[in-house]
């Protein structure tokens, strides 16, 4: 430690009334000094020195023994100093932390992080802007087509298949509605036949003179009710199969058709924009717009071609599945109705067994899918 003359090294050591060093002042100053430094800047990174004979010695002072003394030197003591704290605060304020984590000196100001953080609000705003622009283009295209001013891309063969599918769906929905009405009426008739059979059976027991007559009618009504329940099971199975075909299989295909039509509108909208730009002048301002429009047109053209291919494949598989399902269900419906009105109970039961139709026993819950495996 460099020795200075007594004239320049007036050590300031606060002491108590007992002659001991006042540690409370030292700890309080160190705490204030740490609070005044920015995060990451330690005491080891700061230096306070005195220059000149007449400069004010505040902050760091050296307390040492006089020259020639055998006593060991006293350690450095930090005494509270507002001037030193203000200087350290100014030095710390001139530091910024760049992206690499290194500190560089600036003129002053708060600590700034150079890493760019993506703003979620800006990303959402950009998505909304793109969606609004796309919606505007598609709406303009639809209005132009309805007014007869714009052109639209048409696949005649595919459009004809889609129209037939929609027309068939309406007809199948009508058949489904009528079959449900028949099932409801048949259920009420079977319920009435059961009640009538029970009434005949009760009267056959109480009327000895008409015992046989009431008994025959009771047996007939019970047999009709039993056959009606069998026919009702076949009709309900027919309804369930047609309902799955109409409201799930066909509906799924029509959802794909809807996506195809939306892709067609977008394709025509961006095609129209590209055609309008190509008809205009070509200069330094319009060429970037034409290139961007060409890029967007190509993207929507690929999307349109893909959706058209998907619709064609789905229509093909739907037609095959529809023929297979409806053929089996129509044969079941015809055989069950014919056997019921012919009074052929064995043929009616054989028909249900042939098509794997299970009748629900009254008072017994249907088995779960695990029990059916």
Curated annotation (Swiss-Prot):
It holds the Pfam family Arfaptin. It comes from the Eukaryota. It is found in: Golgi apparatus; Golgi apparatus, trans-Golgi network membrane. The modification Phosphoserine is found at residues 5, 36, 39, 69, 79, 132. The keyword Metal-binding does not apply. Plays a role in controlling biogenesis of secretory granules at the trans-Golgi network. Mechanistically, binds ARF-GTP at the neck of a growing secretory granule precursor and forms a protective scaffold. Once the granule precursor has been completely loaded, active PRKD1 phosphorylates ARFIP1 and releases it from ARFs. In turn, ARFs induce fission. Through this mechanism, ensures proper secretory granule formation at the Golgi of pancreatic beta cells. The keyword Amino-acid biosynthesis does not apply. Its main location: Golgi. Residues 153-353 form the AH domain. The modification Phosphothreonine is found at residue 361. The lineage of its organism: Eukaryota, Metazoa, Chordata, Craniata, Vertebrata. InterPro entries: AH/BAR_dom_sf (IPR027267), AH_dom (IPR010504), Arfaptin_fam (IPR030798). GO terms for cellular component: cytosol; Golgi membrane; trans-Golgi network membrane. Phosphorylated by PRKD1; phosphorylation delocalizes ARFIP1 from the Golgi and disrupts its ability to inhibit the activity of ADP-ribosylation factor, an important component of the vesicle scission machinery. Forms homodimers or heterodimers with ARFIP2. Interacts with non-myristoylated GTP-bound ARF3, but not to GDP-bound ARF3. Interacts with ARF1. Binds with lower affinity to ARF5 and with very little affinity to ARF6. Interacts with ARL1. Interacts with ATG9A. Keywords: Acetylation, Golgi apparatus, Membrane, Phosphoprotein. Disulfide bonds: none annotated. One of its GO terms (molecular function) is protein domain specific binding. It comes from Mus musculus. Residues 22-35 have a biased composition (Basic and acidic residues). GO terms for biological process: intracellular protein transport; negative regulation of retrograde transport, endosome to Golgi; regulation of protein secretion. This is Arfaptin-1.
């Amino acid at each position: 430690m460099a020795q200075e003359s007594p004239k320049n090294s007036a050590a300031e050591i606060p002491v108590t009334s007992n002659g001991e060093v006042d540690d409370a002042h030292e700890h309080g100053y160190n705490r204030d000094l740490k609070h005044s430094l920015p995060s990451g800047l330690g005491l080891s990174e700061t230096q306070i020195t005195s220059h000149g004979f007449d400069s004010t010695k505040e902050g760091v002072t050296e307390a040492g023994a006089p020259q020639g003394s055998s006593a060991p030197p006293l350690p450095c003591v930090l005494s509270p100093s507002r001037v030193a704290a203000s200087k350290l605060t100014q030095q710390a304020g001139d530091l910024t932390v760049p992206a690499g984590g290194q500190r560089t000196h600036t003129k002053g100001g708060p600590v700034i992080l150079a890493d760019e953080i993506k703003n979620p609000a800006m990303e959402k705003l950009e998505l909304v802007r793109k969606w609004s622009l796309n919606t505007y283009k598609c709406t303009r295209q639809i209005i132009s087509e309805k007014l007869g001013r714009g052109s639209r891309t048409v696949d005649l063969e595919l459009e004809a298949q889609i129209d037939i599918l929609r027309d068939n769906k309406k007809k199948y929905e009508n058949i489904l509605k009528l079959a449900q009405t028949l099932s409801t009426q048949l259920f009420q008739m079977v319920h009435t036949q059961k009640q009538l059979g029970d009434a005949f059976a009760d009267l056959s027991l109480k009327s000895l003179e008409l015992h046989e007559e009431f008994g025959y009618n009771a047996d007939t009504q019970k047999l009709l009710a039993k056959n009606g329940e069998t026919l009702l099971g076949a009709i309900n199975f027919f309804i369930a199969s047609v309902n799955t075909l109409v409201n799930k299989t066909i509906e799924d295909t029509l959802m794909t058709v809807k996506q195809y039509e939306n892709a067609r509108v977008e394709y025509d909208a961006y095609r129209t924009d590209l055609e309008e730009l190509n008809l205009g002048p070509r200069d330094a301002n319009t060429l970037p717009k034409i290139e961007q429009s060409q890029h967007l047109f190509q993207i929507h053209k690929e999307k349109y071609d893909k959706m058209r291919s998907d619709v064609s494949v789905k229509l093909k598989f739907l037609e095959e599945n529809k023929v297979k399902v409806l053929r089996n269900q129509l044969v079941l419906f015809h055989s069950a109705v014919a056997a019921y009105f012919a009074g052929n109970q064995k043929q009616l039961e054989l028909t249900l067994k042939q098509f794997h139709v299970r009748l629900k026993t009254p008072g017994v819950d249907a088995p779960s899918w695990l029990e059916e495996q």
